[in-house]
Swiss-Prot record:
This is Ig heavy chain V region HC-3. GO terms for cellular component: extracellular region; immunoglobulin complex. It comes from Heterodontus francisci. InterPro entries: Ig-like_dom_sf, Ig-like_fold, Ig_V-set, IgHV. Residues 1-69 are annotated as: V segment. Keywords: Adaptive immunity, Immunity, Immunoglobulin. Residues 22-37 are annotated as: Complementarity-determining-2. Residues 3-7 are annotated as: Complementarity-determining-1. Residues 74-89 are annotated as: J segment homolog. Residues 1-2 are annotated as: Framework-1. SUPFAM superfamilies: Immunoglobulin (SSF48726).
Amino acid sequence: LGSTTMNWVRQGPGXGLEWLVSYYGPSKNAYAPEIKDRFTASKDTSNNIFALDMKSLKTEDTAIYYCVGQRNYYYFDFWGQGTMVTVTA
């Protein structure tokens, strides 16, 4: 992961891609307003882990979540395989 900017995006059922967070460093991150107080991204470079802690989940959080690496300012370079998260009432 190194100095790569990491991001989380998601795709809900029948919806387009939605940006959630860009991780620039331990205290330099940008969050989408709808998840800012509920989701927290963290990066462990030594173990190549980029995590998303999600709390107070809502049914509308149901989606496939992708971690995405960004070495170039203008586009996402590489994508994780995605993880399906289903939230039921």
